[in-house]
Structure formats: structure tokens, C-alpha cells
Curated annotation (Swiss-Prot):
This is Beta-hexosaminidase. It comes from Histophilus somni (strain 2336). Keywords: Cell cycle, Cell division, Cell shape, Cell wall biogenesis/degradation, Cytoplasm, Glycosidase, Hydrolase, Peptidoglycan synthesis. Belongs to the glycosyl hydrolase 3 family. NagZ subfamily. Its EC number is 3.2.1.52. It catalyses: Hydrolysis of terminal non-reducing N-acetyl-D-hexosamine residues in N-acetyl-beta-D-hexosaminides. GO terms for cellular component: cytoplasm. The keyword Hydrolase applies.
Amino acid sequence: MSILLIDLSGQELRQEEIELLEHPLVAGLILFSRNFYDIEQIRHLIRSVRQKVKKPLLITVDQEGGRVQRFRQGLTQLPAMQSFACLLSDPQEQQEMAWRAGWQMAAEMTALDIDLSFAPVLDLGHQCKAIGDRSFHYEEKKLIELAEKFIQGMRQIGMSATGKHFPGHGHVLADSHLETPYDDRAKELIFAQDIRPFQSLIKQGLLDAVMPAHVIYTQCDNQPASGSSYWLKEVLRQQLGFQGAIFSDDLGMKGAGFMGDFVARCTQSLQAGCDLLLLCNEPEAVVQVLDRFKPQESQNKRIIRQTRLNKLFKKQRIDWQTLRTQRDWLENHKKLTALQQDWLAYKG
């Protein structure tokens, strides 16, 4: 049973990490800035993983754009998602740039042999310090329009889309990396606003995966959405009809601590409805979970999970050197870099 996505300590693959990645519970890995020095190094690292680990691994990253962009040197500096609507006055131009950003991000990541970037962010508004300019907009209609184009750009390249952070992280001030946030708004308001982007994109068949928030919505349930069967099974699966994969957000984050120790967090998230669990920046916890976590599931559930996982691997890959000579890449690189520079100047 492959469930966990774990991380690496540095820029070279270590023997003990190969052994961890080959564990039956491990489905893939997520890369961070500490794993990246330059293009040649990251290509070598990923090639080492593919060659030395004797099973297919889903290799992932957070390459959203703006401040959440793990790899920078030698790659397009993607603009923050808020910049499209904030700096561009023409709605058609806003949508075109969102499409270009989705295409460019997916093209560069798949050229590096990465399967999936956890994008786009579908949270409404910019007041939450953990979200901020990662959000497209504060209005659901505008957010949906821009997210549609971003995803269509990703899909053109063959990368699956992951909507996050369900049912919406945008209206809490606390940062779930540091603590468990609470959203005290009425259930009716959350369903009328925050859930609408997820609902619309699921209905259009544009979301391949969803990542829930480590947020407790006090008027709906007493557990974080990432460990809540109400949010994941009743709302996401049954009410919204979502059939794709559900990733937990990083269970190493402080916001997940409400669910207990690391084994308890994995157990609760899996039982609540997550298919794949991220556990990052906690190497001792990874060893602990691999030793002690004993999921009890039917064979049918395991087959469904594996099917969902298999659909997330990249559908195609352009050679890195070839990509950088393509007219689309060159044009996107120029326009997106300029927009990000304008955004940084705008924010001062």
C-alpha cells in the first residue's frame, strides 16, 4: 500500500533515503528549495531517484509562482497569482497570462522529470498571511475564471491540477505552518463563498486532486479539514462528487498537531478520506511512521487509491534543452518575468 510522500535532506540522494523511498508505504516525494542548487544538479538528483529506487515514485514540488517557488535559478520567475487581476486591466489579458503561467510552470517542471506541482491555490482573498498573494482574487467568480485558465495551461502540457486548500484557507489570520487556525464563520457563508471555486472546477472536471486545509471550521466540525470525514467524505466526495485523489497537507506542520502524534495524524487523515499523506521536514517522524503506521483497509480501497495515484503522473515530457528553444517558452518567459518584476515593484 503506497500512501506517504516524504522529502530529502539535501542536494544529493543518500543511501538511507533510497531505503526509505523503497518502503512499501512510500508513494512519492516532495522537493524543496534545499534540494535545489541549479538546473543540472536538480536533474541529476531526480535522475538518481528514478534510477536507484526500484519502483515508480510520484515526484512533486510546490512551484506555484510568486513567493512559493522552490526552484528559481535558471527557471522562469513566475508571477504571484494576485498580480494577474491586480496589475492587468483587461480581463482577457488577465486570463491569457494565467494560462501562460500554468503552461510555463508545468512545462518547466515536467522537463525536469517532476510529475506534479501542487497548484493552483483556490483560497479566496489575501488577508491570511499564509496565503496572501498566492490567491488569484477575493471574488469567487474572478478566481474561478483565472484558475480555469491556469489549469488549462497545465493540462496542455500534461500535468494534473491540485486545488488547495479545501474548503478554503483565505479567511483565517493564523498560519497553519505555525499553529492550528480556527475559522468561526457560519457554515452557510463558507458554502456560499469559499467552496464555490472547488465546486465549479470539480463540476468542469478540471481538478485531478484536492488538498484540504489544516483549519478547524468551528461551525461545521471540530476537526481540521485534513482529518475530517465530514469535509472529505460527506462534502467533497458525496456532495461535490469529487472522484480524484485527496492529498493531506504536510502532516509535519504545527497546524496538524491538533490530531496528535505523527502516527495519529496519519491514521486520522487516512480514515477521514485522504488518499495520500505528506510528511515533510521531520526525518525522525518519517522513520517512526514507517515503523509503526499499520493502515487497515480493504483490498478494494487500496485498488481505488492506487488508481487515483497512477492518474497523477505526468502525461508527457519535453526535453529541457528543447523546451528552452521553443517560441512559446521564450515568449512566456519574457512576459511572465516582466509581470513578476512589476509586481515586486508594486508591492514596494
